[in-house]
Amino acid sequence: MDKKLYETYVRILNKELVTAMGCTEPIAIAYAGSLARKTLGVIPNKILIEVSGNIIKNVKSVIVPHTHGNKGIETAACIGITGGDAEAELEVISHVTEEDIVAMTELMNSASIKVQPLESPYSLDIRLTVSNNEHEAMVHIAGTHTHIVEMTKDNETIVCREALKQTIDEDYLTLTMHDIYTFAKEVEIDDVKELLDQMIECNTAIAQEGMNGDYGANIGKVIAIRKDLPSLLKAYAAAGSDARMNGCELPVVINSGSGNQGLTVSVPLIVYTEREHLDKEKLYRALVISNLTAIHLKTEIGRLSAFCGAVSAGAACGAGLAYLKDASEEVMNHTIVNALAITSGIICDGAKASCAAKIAVSVEAGILGYDMYMNGQQFYGGDGIISKGIENTIHNIGVLGSQGMASTDQEIIKIMCE
């Protein structure tokens, strides 16, 4: 494999597979809150939170960790202000104390807090302004969860960066299924081992916690009533989401900015490897395939849209499972196409308990997509949104998610705000 392309793929994995505690959208608000408080220097008595529609959608119904079960935008901002560590970025509230939670409650009860929708070209856009009687500070994050566009204190600029361009990073344009498969077969394990070990450790732990605890609708435990292996692959992935969406304080290694997608591309592969007693190196290579495939699928769709991210992650999971079963590149590609043909209509209506069920359905689509092709069955080019050739189908999904479902996204947000 070309050395430059090899290094690009390693760089993409290092950029995308990062650790986060809690659903990433409320955590981004908490991060903005921690930065704003640090800039102001004191706890504010007035807070203005301006957010894009997709942030409203993804924060409204999800429990924020370390808040005693509280949900929503105000909660995320206030725990960031009272207990956040700005240096920790997506783990900003990982070291919150009981005193911080008490202070959060007091702040929510005493401060003037206003949430406003923000008209923005970015699906991810947060502008948080805090003040006391003497000073004011503002933090603006846009494009990605930790990309600071602007910071000010008393209208004096502290940070001013160019907003991320609404174009795809050139690194990501190099992704193709052929090169992903080649990279996974050839990658030096030491180049990805530390990254993937962290994913295995973190994502296994929260999946197990979801199976042990009582979180949300307990989708994982419901599915696990059936003891067969395909059910367990779905169950453990769903259990991780059960826990994550409902306030579990364990971290997750994310994919494409999403913890749920990180769980979907990893946990079924980890469980399958353990149950089938496969070697660790094979798991590493399968995780390379599933992670890069999910990133490839999401590149044109975008970080936040009306297209459920579990769908693309479930198809990517199917590709990883195919690799674990010694499948060829051809089988892997048909697995992905079949899976996308099954589940691509699932909408994203925000982060919440039902995400776990959508993960289970999407993993099932990945499994079925593989089983179909291994039994001589497939969906063909011309069947709905499927085109001849894997890359053409991936492009169709990208157009559907980014352009075709834009108005759907607005209607979902409108319904959720009623």
Language-model features, listed with the residues they occupy:
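Conserved phosphate/anionic-ligand binding catalytic regions in large, soluble enzymes, centered on
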Residues: 19-35, 250-267, 308-312
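Acidic-glycine-rich active-site phosphate/pyrophosphate-binding loop
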Residues: 1-10, 41-56, 228-247, 279-297, ...
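Flexible, glycine/charged-enriched surface loops at secondary-structure junctions
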Residues: 43-47, 88-93, 115-116, 190-196, ...
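Hydrophobic alpha-helical bundle architecture
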Residues: 36-39, 65, 272-285, 295-361, ...
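Early transmembrane hairpin of solute transport permeases
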Residues: 27-126, 130
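Signature of multi-pass transmembrane helix bundles
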Residues: 108-247, 411-418
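Glycine/charged-rich beta-loop-alpha catalytic/anionic-binding loops adjacent to active sites
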Residues: 9-18, 55-63, 243-254, 294-304, ...
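A structural signal for small-residue-enriched, beta-sheet-centric alpha/beta enzyme cores
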Residues: 20-24, 54-58, 62-65, 142-146, ...
